[in-house]
């Protein structure tokens, strides 16, 4: 029966037994008993036992019902109604074999199937019931957690309410401050509206001026049109008359020939002799023409008049091109010809050639060709004297005219120069200059003006004589009439100037005739219009200089041009422009600094206390037995506890049990807060009120205290940093300080984790377990190291904490510190001797952890930080400098000291097989990978478990780094060869400079190497010649081959790889990498082409003078032979001249000529006879009888400023200009014999003058030489120092240009600004002889990290060079107008007290404005070096008070007129005529009053030293009693410099001592004390120092009136305390003018005491 029910789905074709066997076989196939585990077998056994018991029960029941069931089965279902049942019965009865199955299903099999299904359902239900029970358990746990969260929510809500209350108070305070600030904003807005209104007024005035200017332009255009019309009529009439004249001349000539012919025929007939007609007619015509001119010249004075309005034209008809000769009366000697006389056209600009032969043939006149024009250069050179205007545009230059073509008429206006905006500028070509024509005007008008402006007794404007033969001036009165004729000529010129004045209506310069705006232009003027005169004065006696001849001005051109309506671009943008007699100053440059100072002063007020994240209760530490009285007070300013990323300890959720009696033990001392971090509590009153509100009454009440919750309270006190509560709890007996909460956190762990150093110290002193670990194995040291609390780490280490303790995962404190990038903790642990090679369970080392975070500093400390020998830790700066220099190269200590970690640690692989290099490369941490690669034992080819190398997993940047791992870094140097000795001014020039390091890899080819060298040179040249600090990466995007200085790869002469010569593009058999390794090439040297090759590239690189300018200088020397270089002292004149001479010498030698350089130094005793001997001995002067040699001589005359040029060179000017045997000159030798000499044409003469401008009689020499002026404010000198210092910095950094914010760049920029500001101030003071060239600043030291070295060098330069030159220059200027008895030398040797005071004031102003201003050193360090500068202790207030004590109120306006006048040019020693009367009157008053005061105040003449006392007593009348107008004007210039905003503010840098007292402008307050009584604010000494440019006060007794609507600026000068009450009530403030109202001091006061105190209350600036 049991087997029959084994099959649930019987098969009709098989017996039940077979079905059961098939089911058993299927069950065997489904699972194998052998594979079951022990528990599974037990379960199977239990199931099978239950199955057997169930089967037994079924069997018993079936046996009881057996009989009934069989009867029912066999017979109960058969009836007559169902024929199918009968068929079944018959089937079963008839079938004999057992193979047939019954027709219907066996009931037992059905029962078995039902039982199996029920068992399956029972199993499913049991599984679902178990799952439901587990879900019910989870639900219960979640309910418990929800309840806990609700309780926590209630607590947080209560805290939030408290925080809201506190925040509400803070918000009220902020609202109050906002109201105050809004009031200030309204005030500032009102001020802004006022300023904008003034600006609108100025704009309206400017628009009106523009309209007037446009109207004037229209009128001038109309007048020009009229003049053009008239001139065209005149031209027509002239041409008609000229044609008629030519016809008459031809007819006259024919008649003369016929007459001569007839006379000859008559003579022949008379004589009756037979003569042969051998002479041809043209020959006789030519001879007769010569005779005619000769007779005209000898008989009467003849003049050749050439029309100026016609251009050069040539025709085949030579008869019409002869100059017209007409007689002039000898008695008058007038250089002018009557208006009816018409001249002919000049054939060439250089036709006339002064000669001895009176009869110059026509062929000689025509033979001269048109001179070639020098190509216009990108950089213009001012060659013929100082230039004060803008450089003309070379693009408008007219090309040279061919000799056989007539230029078109439309080209004539293009000849005019482009400098209509500029003052007079000297010509660029020598010996003489051309007169400028204004652009936009018709050349005929210019010609008319030019004609009346010339001087007929001089050579013409181009230095050429006329085309007619020269004739002697036979009139004895001609020279006497020169002045009258000159005045007449000037009158006509002024009349014509109405139509030829420049378009830009610039006012003419004061003190100069109105026609002084005539400029000059480049050599285009060679083909321009000109006037020819016949009469010529003998060269031995120089003619008087025409007043308007450019290049011959009697007054040297000033270094700074007059300010016009269009300000010159060379001036600074904040320079005040003089427009319509009103001075408009731009915004002062000191505003940003002023804002910064104000922000610093408002800092204590604006920085409100930072609120802690939790409320706090201050617990005051009291002695034993005292009650706690300040428990409930709130400390708003407490710092929040620094717990970044940390969870609150679990034990803090417990309820509090507060004792009712608290006693203090005197053994627990309060811990100072000085050792706490900024994030920790900064006092003993630390935060403690994060608990329930019942803390205060419980603590204040008495009674016994239960000890049940004390460990929990201890945990909270330690976690929150409550030192007071912690010390109270530690004093109780029976308290377990090592108690751990559920997470295993002890009180020491919580304190260390949160960084509470004081709490850690208290717990450690109470003998808490220092190595107590939590449930994860982390000790307090691990927690502190992970959170970066280095002070706690240091404290725990000092208490012998286990520094190598490993947590459950193997993490040590060092590993945790590296993982979080806490380098202070890493340093402390390393110095304590921790093990760097401890590995975690995953195989990670601290190196893996540091690299994984990408922290370079941590990795460097791990690899390079050594354990101190005696336990002294390295200084932080030393350790950083020793390991943090990535690009130091050979200078880096890493290249000297080896890494301290072994190679095994660097190459250690973790569980996945990854080394630290794998991690760094895969994450793209290039810096970390570079540090790892520097370790010699790194194995970059090591593979991980996936068979990948470091290169396989690296990013692109890291792959590039790995590829360059074995690359050779070869430094690339530029060499300029040998530099000449230092006497040529080249002692500061460097021979070699390292520009970069080339990376040569194994796969680098020679083509790639050539491209790299060329690109590196190009980038370097562009970087050093740029305007800003460029790095090599910034330059690579620029594809231009030439730099601003003209150097490129084409400037290379040769390249050496080590010692092997190589050229760009050359290839060797070996690769560059193998070649460098084999030849051991340590450097690559590039040699530039120099003078030896006839090039100037090396000179350009050594001196930083652009190559185009050097080539232009060389062209001038080759073309004109006589060139003089002049400029301020130190402008490298000697170096430039010597290098040009060398280059010229080698060029001549290459051309096959022998050449020699002769150098002579000129001193005060150098005489004309010595110069003559030099010329004769060097074969420059050759006797007339001797034939010239082919040898070429270069003569260099140095230091010509030490002698008088006019006396030294006067006799040599004529033969130097005309070098031929036809113009000899007689010289007398030392033996008394005289002989005729002439200058050799192959002689080159170059001279140097260390003087900014020529003066006096030296100007007579100017027209005979080509002059090259080296101005300090123009190229090449202007940018030379900047380029030179930038190259020095690049060389110092091994080719790597630092960033602009680098201290080295700042100190170099400061040195550069010192040179520029110094020269700017000296030019304003009118002392051009004190100007300095850049040579003195080339030795500026560049020491990275030591800016003090540069400041010390600057002090030596100031004391040794600058200050003596300034003193000498100011004394010489102040002594110019002394009496004859008191000469200049006497004044220099024995200067008066006034002169000494002026010198001291000038030195102090220059030092503060030009030198100390802008120094990047901190104020404290700068004050230490200020004492090294001489002249810095003079009080600047003396300059402000000068000349005011002697004035009455009525004289204030007159002083204003003087002060607001245009600044005098530096080159003029005489005052403008309109300025003299006022100054001379004031000077006499000052002199008289000062003499009286000298007698009355003789006892006050001594001055207390500033070093002994801060108070300075001065008798101003006695100290500044000046005796000349020039001194008075010099002092006024100093006053304007003190208050000028166009220069840097003097008040920013003052004495290091507090000798200047500054106040804010008091507006309309009558007395300054009333202002001080307002809102006060104590400031520190740093804020009292005169760094702020706006804490000033203006005091004056005179009326505060404005001139021409321009308001006055407040004074930046200090105010004497004794005269504080003299502030005027009507003082006004403004920032639109650079003039200053001066302090007026009563005459009756004998002395003014300048008391200065450090701790004074100053009024806050009212911004």
From Swiss-Prot:
The name this protein goes by in its record: Cortactin-binding protein 2
Principal location class: cytoplasm
GO cellular component annotations of the record: cell cortex; dendritic spine; FAR/SIN/STRIPAK complex; glutamatergic synapse; postsynaptic actin cytoskeleton; synaptic vesicle
Matches recorded under SUPFAM superfamilies: Ankyrin repeat (SSF48403)
Pfam family, one: AAA_lid_NAV1
Residues found modified as Phosphoserine: 1524
Highest taxon above the source species: Eukaryota
Intrachain S-S bonds: none
Organism field: Homo sapiens
Tissue expr: Highest expression in brain. Also expressed in kidney, pancreas, lung, heart, liver, skeletal muscle and placenta.
UniProt cross-references to PANTHER family, sorted A to Z: CTTNBP2 N-TERMINAL-LIKE PROTEIN (PTHR23166:SF9), FILAMIN/GPBP-INTERACTING PROTEIN (PTHR23166)
């Amino acid at each position: 029966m049991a087997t029959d029910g084994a099959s649930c789905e019987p098969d009709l074709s098989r017996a039940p037994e077979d079905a059961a066997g098939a089911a058993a076989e299927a069950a065997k196939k489904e699972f194998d008993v052998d594979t079951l585990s022990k528990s599974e077998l037990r379960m199977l056994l239990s199931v099978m036992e239950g199955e057997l018991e169930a089967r037994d029960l079924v069997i018993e029941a079936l046996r009881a019902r057996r009989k009934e069931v069989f009867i029912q089965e066999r017979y109960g279902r058969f009836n007559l109604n169902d024929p199918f049942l009968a068929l079944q019965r018959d089937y079963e009865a008839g079938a004999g074999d057992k193979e047939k199955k019954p027709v219907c299903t066996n009931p037992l099999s059905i029962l078995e199937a039902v039982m199996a299904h029920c068992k399956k359902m029972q199993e499913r239900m049991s599984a679902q019931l178990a799952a439901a029970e587990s879900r019910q358990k989870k639900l219960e746990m979640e309910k418990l957690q929800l309840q806990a969260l609700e309780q926590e929510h209630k607590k947080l809500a209560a805290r939030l309410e408290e925080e809201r209350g506190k925040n509400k108070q803070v918000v009220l305070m902020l609202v109050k401050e906002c109201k105050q600030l809004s009031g200030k904003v309204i005030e500032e807005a009102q001020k802004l509206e006022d300023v904008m209104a003034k600006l609108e007024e100025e704009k309206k005035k400017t628009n009106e001026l523009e309209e007037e200017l446009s109207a004037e332009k229209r009128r001038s255009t109309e007048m020009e049109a009229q003049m053009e019309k008239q001139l065209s009529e005149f031209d027509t009439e002239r041409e008609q008359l000229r044609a008629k004249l030519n016809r008459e001349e031809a007819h006259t000539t024919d008649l003369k020939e016929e007459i001569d012919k007839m006379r000859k025929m008559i003579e022949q007939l008379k004589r009756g002799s037979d003569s042969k007609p051998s002479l041809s007619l043209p020959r006789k015509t030519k001879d007769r023409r010569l005779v005619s001119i000769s007779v005209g010249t000898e008989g009467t004075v003849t003049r050749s008049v050439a029309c100026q309005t016609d251009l050069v034209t040539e025709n085949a008809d030579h008869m019409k091109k002869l100059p017209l000769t007409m007689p002039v009366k000898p008695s008058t000697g007038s250089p002018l010809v009557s208006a009816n006389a018409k001249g002919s056209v000049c054939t060439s600009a250089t036709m006339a050639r002064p000669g001895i032969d009176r009869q110059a043939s026509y062929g000689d006149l025509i033979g001269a060709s048109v001179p070639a024009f020098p190509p216009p250069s990108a950089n213009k050179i001012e060659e013929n004297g100082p230039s004060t205007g803008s450089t003309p545009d070379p693009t408008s230059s007219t090309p040279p005219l061919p000799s056989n073509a007539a230029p078109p008429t439309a080209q004539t206006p293009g000849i005019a120069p482009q400098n209509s905006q500029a003052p007079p500028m000297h010509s660029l070509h020598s010996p003489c200059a051309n007169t400028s024509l204004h652009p936009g005007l018709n050349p005929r008008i210019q010609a008319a003006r030019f004609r009346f402006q010339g001087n007929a007794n001089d050579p013409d404007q181009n230095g050429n004589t006329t085309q007619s033969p020269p004739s002697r001036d036979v009139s004895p009165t001609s020279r006497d009439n020169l002045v009258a004729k000159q005045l007449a000529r000037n009158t006509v010129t002024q009349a014509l100037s109405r139509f030829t004045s420049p378009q830009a209506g610039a006012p003419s310069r004061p003190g100069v005739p109105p026609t002084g705006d005539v400029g000059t232009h480049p050599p285009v003027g060679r083909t321009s219009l000109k006037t020819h005169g016949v009469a010529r004065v003998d060269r031995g006696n120089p003619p008087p200089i025409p007043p308007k001849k450019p290049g011959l001005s009697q007054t040297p051109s000033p270094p700074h041009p007059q300010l016009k309506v269009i300000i010159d671009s060379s001036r600074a943008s904040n320079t005040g422009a003089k427009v319509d007699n009103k001075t408009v100053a731009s915004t002062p440059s000191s505003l940003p600094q002023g804002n910064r100072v104000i922000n610093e002063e408002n800092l204590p007020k604006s920085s409100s206390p930072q609120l802690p994240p939790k409320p706090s209760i201050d617990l005051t530490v009291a002695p034993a037995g005292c009650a706690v009285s300040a428990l409930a007070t709130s400390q708003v300013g407490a710092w929040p506890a620094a717990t970044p990323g940390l969870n609150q300890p679990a034990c803090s959720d417990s309820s509090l049990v507060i004792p009712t009696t608290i006693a203090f033990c005197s053994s627990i001392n309060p811990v100072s807060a000085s050792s706490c971090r900024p994030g920790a509590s900064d006092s003993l009153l630390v935060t403690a009120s994060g608990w329930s509100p019942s803390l205060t009454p419980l603590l204040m009440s008495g009674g016994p205290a239960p000890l049940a919750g004390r460990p929990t309270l201890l945990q909270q006190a330690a976690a929150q940093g409550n030192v007071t509560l912690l010390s109270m709890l530690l004093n109780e007996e029976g308290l377990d300080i090592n108690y751990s909460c559920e997470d295993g956190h002890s009180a020491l762990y919580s304190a260390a984790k949160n960084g509470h150093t004081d709490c850690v110290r208290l717990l450690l002193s109470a003998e808490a377990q220092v190595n107590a670990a939590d449930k994860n194995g982390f000790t307090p040291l691990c927690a502190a190291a992970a959170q970066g609390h280095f002070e706690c780490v240091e404290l725990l280490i000092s208490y012998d904490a286990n520094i190598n303790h490993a947590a459950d995962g193997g993490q040590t404190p060092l590993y945790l510190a590296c993982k979080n990038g806490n380098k202070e903790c890493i340093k402390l642990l390393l110095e304590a001797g921790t093990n760097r090679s401890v590995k975690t369970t995953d195989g990670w080392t601290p190196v893996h952890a540091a690299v994984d975070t990408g922290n370079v500093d941590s990795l460097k400390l791990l690899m390079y930080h050594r354990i101190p020998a005696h336990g002294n830790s390295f200084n932080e700066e030393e350790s950083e400098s020793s390991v943090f220099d990535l690009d130091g190269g050979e200078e880096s200590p890493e290249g000297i000291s080896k890494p301290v970690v072994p190679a095994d640690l660097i190459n250690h692989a973790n569980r996945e097989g990854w080394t630290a290099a794998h991690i760094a490369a895969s994450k793209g941490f290039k810096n970390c990978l570079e540090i790892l690669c520097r370790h010699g034992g790194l194995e970059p080819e090591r593979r991980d478990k996936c068979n990948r190398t470091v290169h396989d997993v690296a990013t692109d940047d890291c792959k590039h780094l790995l590829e360059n791992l074995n690359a050779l870094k070869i430094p690339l140097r530029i060499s300029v060869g040998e530099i000449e000795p230092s006497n040529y001014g080249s002692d500061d020039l460097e021979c070699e400079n390292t520009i970069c390091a080339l990376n040569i890899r194994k796969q680098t080819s020679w083509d790639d190497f050539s491209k790299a060298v060329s690109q590196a040179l190009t980038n370097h040249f562009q970087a050093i010649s740029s305007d800003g600090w460029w790095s090599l990466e910034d330059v690579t995007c620029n594809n231009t081959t030439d730099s601003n200085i003209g150097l490129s790869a084409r400037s290379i002469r040769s390249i050496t790889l080590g010692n092997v010569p190589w050229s760009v593009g050359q290839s060797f058999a070996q690769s560059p990498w193998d070649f460098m390794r084999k030849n051991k090439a340590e450097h690559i040297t590039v040699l530039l082409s120099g003078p030896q090759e006839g090039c100037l590239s090396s000179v350009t690189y050594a001196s930083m003078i652009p190559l185009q300018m050097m080539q232009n200088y060389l062209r001038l020397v080759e073309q004109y032979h006589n060139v003089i270089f002049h400029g301020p002292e130190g402008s490298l004149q000697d170096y430039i001249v010597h290098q040009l001479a060398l280059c010229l010498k080698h060029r001549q030698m290459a051309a096959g000529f022998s050449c020699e350089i002769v150098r002579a130094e000129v001193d005060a005793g150098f005489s004309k006879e010595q110069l003559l001997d030099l010329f004769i001995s060097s074969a420059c002067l050759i006797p007339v009888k001797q034939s010239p040699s082919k040898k070429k001589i270069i003569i260099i005359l140095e230091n010509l400023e030490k002698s008088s040029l006019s006396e030294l060179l006067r006799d040599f000017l004529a033969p130097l200009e005309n070098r031929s045997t036809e113009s000899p000159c007689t010289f007398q030798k030392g033996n008394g014999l005289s002989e005729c000499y002439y200058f050799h044409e192959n002689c080159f003469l170059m001279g140097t003058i260390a003087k900014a401008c020529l003066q006096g009689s030296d100007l007579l020499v100017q027209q005979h030489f080509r002059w090259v002026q080296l101005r300090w404010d123009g190229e090449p000198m202007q940018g030379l120092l900047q380029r030179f210092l930038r190259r020095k910095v690049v060389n110092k950094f091994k080719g790597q240009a630092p960033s602009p914010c680098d201290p080295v760049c700042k100190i170099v920029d400061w040195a550069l600004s010192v040179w520029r500001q110094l020269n700017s101030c000296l030019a304003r003071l009118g002392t051009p002889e004190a100007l300095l060239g850049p040579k003195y600043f080339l030795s500026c030291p560049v020491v990275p990290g030591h800016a003090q070295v540069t400041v010390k060098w600057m002090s030596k330069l100031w004391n040794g060079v600058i200050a003596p030159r300034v003193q000498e220059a100011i004394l010489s200027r102040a002594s110019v107008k002394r009496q004859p008895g008191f000469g200049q030398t006497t004044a220099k040797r024995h200067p008066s007290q006034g002169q000494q005071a002026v010198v001291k004031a000038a030195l102090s102003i220059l030092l503060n404005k030009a030198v100390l201003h802008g120094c990047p050193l901190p104020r404290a360090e700068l004050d230490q070096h200020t004492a090294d500068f001489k002249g810095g202790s003079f009080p600047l207030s003396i300059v402000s008070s000068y000349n005011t004590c002697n004035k009455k109120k009525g004289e204030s306006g007159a002083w204003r007129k003087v002060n607001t006048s245009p600044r005098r040019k530096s080159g003029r020693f005489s005052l403008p005529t309109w300025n003299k009367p006022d100054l001379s009157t004031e000077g006499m008053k000052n002199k008289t009053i000062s003499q009286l005061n000298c007698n009355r105040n003789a006892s006050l003449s001594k001055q207390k030293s500033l070093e002994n006392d801060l108070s300075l007593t001065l008798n101003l009348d006695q100290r500044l009693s000046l005796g000349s107008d020039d001194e008075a004007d010099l002092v006024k210039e100093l006053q304007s410099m003190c208050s000028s905003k166009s220069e840097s503010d003097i008040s920013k840098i003052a004495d290091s001592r507090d000798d200047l007292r500054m106040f804010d402008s008091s507006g309309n307050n009558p007395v300054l004390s009333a202002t001080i009584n307002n809102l006060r604010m104590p400031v520190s000494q740093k804020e009292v120092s005169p760094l702020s440019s706006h804490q000033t006060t203006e005091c004056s007794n005179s009326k505060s009136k404005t001139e021409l609507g321009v308001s006055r600026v407040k004074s930046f000068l200090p105010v004497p305390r004794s005269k504080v009450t003299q502030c005027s009530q009507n003082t006004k403030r403004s920032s639109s003018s650079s003039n200053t109202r001066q302090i007026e001091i009563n005459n009756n006061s004998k002395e003014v005491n300048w008391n200065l105190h450090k701790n004074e209350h100053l009024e806050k600036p009212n911004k």
